[in-house]
């Protein structure tokens, strides 16, 4: 029986011109708002460095990744845009964050205190964006569960030494769904986020960078002031919006005869 090597069965081809088209379409929809290009997980398997360079050339203001290794890969490739790590960063890696000017997500008070202690130990400041959980149910200060406690926690983070709180963000759970319940849920998330932003601002800690929209959010609700929409503009053959997206990937198979 003749066997085929698994690694050669299929691959993805990326059309960088289509990627540019999609980014420009989202940028046009966002109006004057700058965009954060999400290139986590190797840009969803499509080449983080290659995609990030396209986004940078097209005017992205930020890049977002899932972990420190991904952020460092972009820095080593010569990308100088601000980078946000959406996931966890070990406190012991704070010196790298400071040295390479990488921003960490801050999603809980204990985590913030650990980052603060690590930064103070090396005599520096680490930049962080507060992560609000308005209904996604992942990491973040749980505004939907107990708004007052969550806001109090965020305010305490803002007062910690060694931290420079430069942003506030959240993630819409069902912005890509068109049912009445989903639209209502997305609106509730947006309202909670705006309340949190206002609470921080009124206490004297207005974040410089505010971002709550994902790709679906900015396409469906461009009228909502989101500050820095986060978008990933691959547009695969199976998942793309007729409003803007051109498929940027093509699957290729080599099949044995018969």
Where do the language-model regions lie?
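A charged N-terminal "starter" segment
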Residues: 1-103, 109, 117, 164
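Active-site loop/helix belt of alpha/beta enzymes
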Residues: 7, 41-49, 53-54, 58, ...
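Short secondary-structure boundary segments
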Residues: 67, 108-109, 132, 233
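Extended substrate/RNA-proximal surfaces in nucleic-acid metabolism proteins
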Residues: 104-105, 224
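Conserved catalytic phosphorylation-site environment of P-type ATPases
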Residues: 112
């Amino acid at each position: 029986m003749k066997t085929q090597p698994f690694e050669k069965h299929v691959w993805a081809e990326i059309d960088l011109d289509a990627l540019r088209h999609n980014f420009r379409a989202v940028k046009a929809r966002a109006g004057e708002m700058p965009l954060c290009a999400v290139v986590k997980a190797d840009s969803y398997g499509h080449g983080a460095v290659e995609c990030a360079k396209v986004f940078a050339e097209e005017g992205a203001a930020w890049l977002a990744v899932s972990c420190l290794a991904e952020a460092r890969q972009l820095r080593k490739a010569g990308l100088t845009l601000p980078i946000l790590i959406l996931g966890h960063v070990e406190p012991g890696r704070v010196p790298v964050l400071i040295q390479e000017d990488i921003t960490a997500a801050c999603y809980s008070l204990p985590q913030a205190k650990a980052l603060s202690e690590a930064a103070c130990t090396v005599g520096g400041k680490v930049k962080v964006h507060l992560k609000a959980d308005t209904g996604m149910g992942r990491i973040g200060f749980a505004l939907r569960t107990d708004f007052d406690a969550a806001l109090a926690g965020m305010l305490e983070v803002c007062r910690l030494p060694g931290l420079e709180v430069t942003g506030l963000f959240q993630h819409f759970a069902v912005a890509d769904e068109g049912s009445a319940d989903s639209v209502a849920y997305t609106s509730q998330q947006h309202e909670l986020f705006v309340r949190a932003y206002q609470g921080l601002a009124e206490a004297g800690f207005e974040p410089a960078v505010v971002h709550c929209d994902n790709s679906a959010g900015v396409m469906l609700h461009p009228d909502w002031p989101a500050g820095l929409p986060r978008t990933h503009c691959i547009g695969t053959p199976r998942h793309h919006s007729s409003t803007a997206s051109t498929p940027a990937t093509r699957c290729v198979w080599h099949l044995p005869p018969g």
